[in-house]
């Protein structure tokens, strides 16, 4: 049985604990050694393996590099003791702390063969043993990126034969069609793009004033033509949305006569009186209220004008 021991050090240097678990639980406490960097006290029988110098404490390395570095240093710094050589297949678990986390490893010795290293290093980011499966062990370079993008664009068979014409100063992005088969090309464009002229931009700013041609100004009417048209059509039934101020409708002579008669009786209108006038003149109560307000303002202006003239 192989167990792993994980301890969090209080110092900066990487720490590795190495122990032999082949002799039972009692041997675990005896064959256990902790050291910092590579400075450790000598012992008659200890299986010790320090971390390679290439692994800096502040760097994170993938599992493949850790396994290769551990395999290269196992033959130099680790010599199996007699207790390990006497067992049929003894395994030694070890691990070290780096700047990215803890990397546990296992080294097994067999009769008649040299010490082989069996790594089970896992990524510090994932605590499960399946973290290596989702770990990217190869650094992506520019050539790999170019080749992968070339394979991606190889799927778009209709990129070269796109029905759309390239427009200057715009990003040339292909329209991705269905992979099952090319669709029918569109022969008409959404907007007339023939009159487009790219603006000249220099390092110091805009290169003078740029004026649009007459054809370019006419293209803007395509977006605005639908709004006045809908308003003009909706004016007949009055059900659609109306923009702007409502058209003023003058009162008839019969309505004005009735309103003036009520105003001569009382300048301020009550609620019951407003309802009665609204029913007689075929006006809304709001219209009646507004007319009385305007009539009082008009009379006040006339009185002030007479006072100022006299």
Swiss-Prot record:
DNA-binding annotation, residue ranges on this chain: 244-303
Main location class: nucleus
Subcellular location: Nucleus
GO CC terms: nucleus
UniProt keyword annotation of tRNA-binding present: no
Alphabetic keyword roster: Developmental protein, DNA-binding, Homeobox, Nucleus, Transcription, Transcription regulation
One GO term of the biological process aspect: regulation of transcription by RNA polymerase II
Known function: Sequence-specific transcription factor which is part of a developmental regulatory system that provides cells with specific positional identities on the anterior-posterior axis.
Protein name: Homeobox protein Hox-A13a
Taxonomic lineage: Eukaryota, Metazoa, Chordata, Craniata, Vertebrata
């Amino acid at each position: 049985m192989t167990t792993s021991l994980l301890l969090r050090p209080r110092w900066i240097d990487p720490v590795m604990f190495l122990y032999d678990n082949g002799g039972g639980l009692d041997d675990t406490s005896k064959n256990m050694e902790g050291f910092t960097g590579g400075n450790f006290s000598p012992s008659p029988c200890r299986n010790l393996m320090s971390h390679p110098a290439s692994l800096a404490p502040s760097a994170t390395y993938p599992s493949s590099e850790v396994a290769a570095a551990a395999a290269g240093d196992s033959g130099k710094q680790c010599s199996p003791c007699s207790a390990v050589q006497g067992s049929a297949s003894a395994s030694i678990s070890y691990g070290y702390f780096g700047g990215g986390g803890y990397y546990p490893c296992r080294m097994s010795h067999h009769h008649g063969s040299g010490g082989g290293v069996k790594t089970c290093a896992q990524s510090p980011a994932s605590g499960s043993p399946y973290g290596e499966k989702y770990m990217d062990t190869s650094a992506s370079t520019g050539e790999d990126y170019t080749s992968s993008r070339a394979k991606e664009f190889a799927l778009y068979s209709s990129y070269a034969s796109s029905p759309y014409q390239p427009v200057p100063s715009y990003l040339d992005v292909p329209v991705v069609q269905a992979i099952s088969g090319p669709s029918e090309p569109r022969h008409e464009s959404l907007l007339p793009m023939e009159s487009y002229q790219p603006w000249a931009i220099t390092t110091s700013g805009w290169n003078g004033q740029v004026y649009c041609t007459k054809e370019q100004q006419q293209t803007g009417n395509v977006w605005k033509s639908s709004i006045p048209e809908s308003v003009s059509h909706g004016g007949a039934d009055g059900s659609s949305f109306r923009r702007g101020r409502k058209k003023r409708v003058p009162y008839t002579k019969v309505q004005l006569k009735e309103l003036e008669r009520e105003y001569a009786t009382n300048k301020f209108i009550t609620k019951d009186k407003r309802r009665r006038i609204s029913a007689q003149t075929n006006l809304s109560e709001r219209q009646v209220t507004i007319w009385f307000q305007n009539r009082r303002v008009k009379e006040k202006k006339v009185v002030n004008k007479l006072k100022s003239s006299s």
